Each structure stands twice: as C-alpha cells, then as structure tokens.
Curated annotation (Swiss-Prot):
Usually encoded in the trnK tRNA gene intron. Probably assists in splicing its own and other chloroplast group II introns. This is Maturase K. InterPro entries: Domain_X, Maturase_MatK, Maturase_MatK_N. GO terms for biological process: mRNA processing; RNA splicing; tRNA processing. Coiled coil: none annotated. It is found in: Plastid, Chloroplast. Belongs to the intron maturase 2 family. MatK subfamily. One of its GO terms (molecular function) is RNA binding.
C-alpha cells in the first residue's frame, strides 16, 4: 500500500506514462480485488479454488509465468499457439484483466484529482456517489417549453478492437501497456458478444465488468467529445456536469481540452453549435439531443454526427440509428419512465380601454409518467396480481413468518416508490401500492386460513403503517399540518442519487 502511495506522489505529468512494470507487482492484484483491503478478512491469505476466490499464491504463479515468457510480443497469428497460462487460463485471465484495469485507471485518477483540486473553495464529491445516470435528473428538470425537436441517437457500434486500443493512446503513453491490451483482447475474449456486439445494448461478463466498463466508457467518452462544444457554447446545457460528474466509480471526469483541438480543425462546422438552447443527455446505449431549432438545423446535426463518427471511428454508422422526432407529439421510454410533452392550455383575458381580448396560450410541460401497463405486467409475472391488475396471493411465501411476508412486500413497494419518485403524477404509484398491499393481505389470509376481511380487522392499522413509504414519512414530518392531505406535495418530483435500476420484483422466490 505504501509503495503505490509513493508511486502516486511522483510527477503526475510524466511518470504515469510508464504503467507496464506495475503489472508484475503483487499488491496491484490485491488492490484490484479489494480496494478497501479490509484487514479483518483473511481471503487474501487463503489458497482457494479456481472459480471465485483470490490468493497471493495464485498471483505469484501468474507473475512467474509472465516473467518466464515474453508473450506480449507474440504476433496475432501465433495467438492460438500461446499456452503460457496452462489449465488456469480462465482464472489467470480474469486476474490480469482486473489488475490491468486498475493500472490503466491511474492516469484517469490523476487527471481527475488535478481537475477537482482546481475548484478552490468547492467541496470535492465522493466519486462513488456520482454516476452517469445522475445527469438525467437535471435533464428532466430542464424547461422544455422552448424545445421543438429531439434526436434519439444510438451510440455507434460495433467497434473494432484496434479502435479501442487507439482510443487509449490519447491517455496512456506507455507502448508496452498498449501492446498488453492488444494481446489481452485478442487472446482471452471473443468480444463479438461483448464490446463489438451488433446489438445496441452492451452486456459484460460478470467476472470482468471492471475491465470492460473501462474500455466501453473510454469509447463513449470519445463519442461524447463532439458535444463538449455544446457545454461551452450554451448556458442552458445543464444536463451534463463536465467538472464533477463521474462516469463510474473512480476517474471519468469530463476533460475540456478537446475543445481547443476541435476549435482549430473544425472552424467551418462551429456555427452548428451556436444554438443557445441545446439539451444533451446519455443513458444506457443511447443519447438524446433536444433543440429549439428548425427541422433543417436538427437534420444538419444528424448528418454531421454521422459523418464525424464514420471518419473518426472508421465504422459504418448509417443514418437510421439517429431518429428525429417532434417533441410535441412524441413519447419515449426513458429509464423506465414514459416521457412525453403535453400542452397545458391557458386563457388570458386582456383589457384595453373599452375592449377586452381573450388570448389562448399553450405551455409545453415535460411529463415523466409511470408506465402502468408494463409495471402491472411485471407484477403479474411475479405472481402478485393478474394481467388485469387484480391482486392475488403469493403461495410461495405462505411458509414464511408474518413479519417476513410483510417485510418483503413492503420492500418491493418502497423500491418502486423510491425509483419512480421523479414521476410527475403519483396516482399510478398508489394503484401499485394498493395491489401489493392487498396481495400481502391475501397471502397472510391464505397462510392463516382466513378471509381477507377477517385478517384486516384483526391486524388493524398496522399493515397500513408498514406500507407507509419513507417519502411519505419524511413529508409528514416536514409538513405536519398537511399530513392529512399531501396531494400537492406528492406531485413534486424527487430524485435520489442512489437510484441505478429497479430491483428484481422476484428476488425472493
């Protein structure tokens, strides 16, 4: 641990370029396996099996094999002949990927620390609390009244392996590390089902998520470098915080140096970026770019992005992956929400001397609604209700104690309320709560061989209190006078930074 601290204290502008020797250091694999290095855990001192554990003995064997064979200089034609890892190929390759990902993250970490330290007087956010999904919250809170069109963009795919290596050349100057990456990609994984997937969504092996998240986010960063102009040209682009918003856990700060490069090489196209009302956000494998401009302007954006990505990444990116939609009559599935723009009609009466005028005005409002039909379908699949939304009992849980049954239903209800707290209309959530509450009552009544009416009379209001969500409890304490009628407060949208996805409804089979 002290050795890596000394390494991080070296000249950050030069020494981080030489990362290759770290691949032979044992502590790198320990840090990659357990960054906290909890001293109470003895797993690092064990000699376990090959599948799911780690030991220094296996690390020593791996490093010894790497010292004995200069396998990083082998050509791609001889990859199938290289058997230096022997029978432990799967385990050793996983360990190398974890160690390599940890090492390559060092330059990004140093750049991030340097950029955050430049903000004097500002508190540095803990990186593990910020992810790219959090940029969607201010995007949904933006004022969409002036926007007309939106671009739905699929991030370019598939990607050639060499493109991934070339992308990292801008950050990692160590040629040996790049040779190791190239060798590693060709030797150990068939990425046709991972990074180079022909599907818009990317899936990663659970054993090597850190390594592939690193590669994927590096590639996405290159794709998003085009939009750095927007942040500098527009004061309304509040959706992506390039200074503090981190992409994953450690180091993905948004660097603005690319602006200078683009400003010199693409003077002709800079006028496209002068729209003061552009909104950009990325989620999963898609991006959204909204504008107040005309159809002609947004169409120019479309062809510019297609040509830029084709030239920069040497891939065939056809225009069918970018769709132009008019915001006023288009709805989309967005992070589990059904998002749409609706017109709120209003009438204004104007009095001028003896004449009066009635002026009709329509204000655009961006709604984030709970998709009730898919959500009921998920509940029906998990046997909480029928496909029509009628609550039914959960026979699988009848053997559990009453407290466990209630706790499981309450947890699902609170998870759904927590995730969809940003909905502009909460009525659907209360319907979901009704389904889960009555399903819980039917399950308990089935267990005690009683009717629902009899069980509810015996339990009283305790079951209702259990299903009181944490949001309702907080609002009741904050607004005690309005605890009986919090309809107006519940209509406000609340966003939580610990929201990443909806937990599986059928976790407790």
């Amino acid at each position: 641990m002290e050795e890596i601290q000394r390494y991080l204290q070296l000249d950050r502008s030069q020494q981080h370029n030489f990362l290759y020797p770290l691949i032979f250091q044992e502590y790198i694999y320990a840090l990659a396996h357990d960054p906290g290095l909890n001293r109470n855990r003895s797993i690092l001192l064990e000699n376990p099996g090959y599948n799911n554990k780690f030991s220094f003995l296996i690390v020593k064997r791996l490093i010894t094999r790497m010292y004995q064979q200069n396998h990083f200089l082998i050509s791609t034609n001889d990859l199938n002949k290289n058997e230096f890892l022997g029978c432990n190929k799967s385990l050793y390759s996983q360990m190398i990927s974890e160690g390599f990902a940890f090492i390559v993250e060092i330059p990004f970490s140093l750049r991030l620390i340097s950029s955050l330290s430049s903000f004097e007087g500002k508190k540095i956010f803990k990186s593990h609390n910020l992810r790219s999904i959090h940029s969607t919250f201010p995007f949904l809170e933006d004022n969409f009244a002036h926007l007309n069109y939106v671009l739905d963009i699929l991030i370019p795919y598939p990607v050639h392996l060499e493109i991934l290596v070339q992308t990292l050349r801008y950050w990692v100057k160590d040629a040996s590390s790049l040779h190791l990456l190239r060798f590693f990609l060709h030797e150990y994984w068939n990425l046709n089902s991972l990074i180079t997937s022909k599907k818009p969504g990317y899936s990663f092996s659970k054993k090597n998520q850190r390594f592939f998240f690193f590669l994927y986010n590096s590639y996405v960063y290159e794709c998003e470098s085009t939009f750095v102009f927007l942040r500098n040209q527009s004061s309304h682009l509040r959706s992506t915080s390039f200074g503090a918003l981190l992409e994953r856990i450690f180091f993905y700060g948004k660097i603005e140096r690319l602006v200078e490069v683009f400003a010199k090489d693409f003077q002709v196209t800079l006028w496209l970026f002068k729209d003061p009302f552009m909104h950009y956000v990325r989620y999963q494998g898609k991006s959204i770019l909204a504008s107040k401009g005309t159809f002609l302007l947004i169409n120019k954006w479309k062809f510019y992005l297609v040509n830029f990505w084709q030239c920069h990444f040497s891939l065939c990116f056809h225009t069918g992956r970018i769709h132009i939609n008019q915001l006023s009559n288009h709805s989309r599935d967005f992070m589990g929400y059904l998002s749409s723009v609706r017109l709120n009609p209003s009438m204004v009466r104007s009095q001028m001397l003896e004449n009066s005028f009635l002026i009709n005005n329509a204000i655009k409002k961006f709604d984030t609604l709970v998709p009730i039909i898919p959500l009921i379908g998920s509940l029906a699949k998990a046997n909480f209700c029928t496909v029509l939304g009628h609550p039914i009992s959960k026979p699988v849980w009848s053997d559990l104690s009453d407290s466990d049954i209630i706790a499981r239903f309450v947890r699902i209800c609170r998870n759904l309320f927590h995730y969809y707290s940003g909905s502009s209309k909460k009525k659907t959530l209360y319907r979901i709560k009704y389904i889960l509450r009555l399903s819980c009552a039917r399950t308990l009544a089935r267990k005690h061989k009683s009717t629902v009416r009899t069980f509810l009379k015996r339990s009283g209001s305790e079951l209702l209190e259990e299903f009181l969500t944490s949001e309702e409890q907080v609002l009741s304490l904050t607004f005690p006078r309005a605890s009986s009628s919090l309809g107006g407060v519940y209509r406000s949208r609340i966003w939580y930074l610990d929201i990443f996805c909806i937990n599986d409804l059928a976790n407790y089979q």
